[in-house]
C-alpha cells in the first residue's frame, strides 16, 4: 500500500511538471497561438505577393511575345502615335462647385439684409 502512495505522488509531480511546461515553458500555448497568427498573416501577405508576381509575369510574357502591349505602352506612357495618324486629346471640364453664401448674406438676389426677418 505504501508503494501505491509513492507512485501517486510521483505521477502527481510529473503531471504538475508537464502542466508547467505546457503553460509557461518554451513552446507554451501562448507562443503557439502567436506563431499561428504570424503564419496566417504571412500566408495572406504571400498570396498578395504571388498575385502581383503573376501579373508581372503575364506582362513580361505579353511584352516579349506581342506587339500590341508594346504599342499600348508607347501610346499611353510615351505619347507616341503612328505615322499618318491623327491624335485627338479630349479634355474634360473641371467640375464647378457652387459658391456657398457667406453668413449674414441673403440667399436671394435683390433682397436687402434689413428686409430679411
From Swiss-Prot:
Disulfides per UniProt: none
Cytoplasmic side: 1-6
Domain of life: Bacteria
A Gene Ontology cellular-component term: cell septum
GO biological process per UniProt: FtsZ-dependent cytokinesis
Subcellular location: Cell inner membrane
Coiled coil segments of this chain: 29-69
Segments passing through the bilayer: 7-24
Positions on the Periplasmic side per record topology: 25-117
Keywords, in A-Z order: Cell cycle, Cell division, Cell inner membrane, Cell membrane, Coiled coil, Membrane, Transmembrane, Transmembrane helix
Membrane topology label: Single-pass type II membrane protein
Function, in words: Essential cell division protein. May link together the upstream cell division proteins, which are predominantly cytoplasmic, with the downstream cell division proteins, which are predominantly periplasmic.
Family of this protein: Belongs to the FtsB family.
Complex formation: Part of a complex composed of FtsB, FtsL and FtsQ.
UniProt name for this protein: Cell division protein FtsB
Organism of provenance: Stenotrophomonas maltophilia (strain R551-3)
